[in-house]
Amino acid sequence: MLPLQVDWRPDDFHLLRDMKFAALVLSCLMAVTVSADKGKKTLSALAIGNSFSDPVWKSMPPVAAAMGCELDIASAMIGGADLKKHWNKFLEAQTNANYRPYSFHRSICGKSIRGTKVNLIEALMTNDWDVVTVQQASHCSMLPRTYAPYGDDLVSAIRKICPKAKIYVQETWYYLPFGAKDLASGVAQQREEHDKIVNAYADFARRVSADGIIPMGSAVQLFRNRLPVVYRENDSGGDVVGNNLSFEKDETGHWRLAKGSDFCHLGPEGEYLQALVWTAKLFGVDVRECPYVAPSVRDPSRAALMKACAALAVMGGREGNRAE
């Protein structure tokens, strides 16, 4: 492990590369300050992760605003990155300030900032963040051995650069059950892997003394149970996970996912659920009263259930998967 170079400074011009950006940041931060003076809840958060965390910089601002909260949120992501990759990218940035492997997007007061490329040191030093979040990649999130030492080292480095920031861990979710040999096995596997994921994140959060867990995986599982999601061989049953799903029959006449189907990531409705969970956890508000519903959620009863599941997950509710 290389010693952390706390005196390292990013190229400010790279992040504030035009006056329009700087003016927008200044005006929005002034608005946040005024809101704080008026008693509104304010928060700045940086999400370090991959495609399982990246949607929040777009989906969370309208939910937070609807709850009367001021939000400055950014995402630093590399597709598919696990904690080991994040740590290795951090070490590389310590010796090469021009190494910028992360896509960086930010929304201040609901206004999106043009995306750029950064390294983690730049992302962490861009703002005096209130919260920094980390997560494990979904494909290994159920394996406790994959969290150490990389996640521990990463959290330690974050604390040295952002000593005032609270550290939160996003708990990820398990996939749709269509990758197993049959649907029944897939549903059983989903239940088992979800429990392993929850336990692995809890152990990691305790070990690094995280300030909290953002229980997104638990919220997804609660929604699956409470709807309830009823899977069929060619139907995802209303799950909030999955994109561009289509099914085809194989040579034996059995249904399978067609090429190009995404059975891992959140669908548009799932991104709304994620925004509810993050808002509830980070701001400490009851999102069951949230007046905003994302355009992707057309059924009021589903929207109400998502709000309830988000609130329950944040309050500590946890269930194994009973979907069939």
Regions found by a protein language model. Give the residues of each.
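Hydrophobic h-region of N-terminal signal peptides that target proteins for export
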Residues: S27-S35
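Alpha-helical cap/lid subdomain in secreted, periplasmic
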Residues: T116-P268, E289
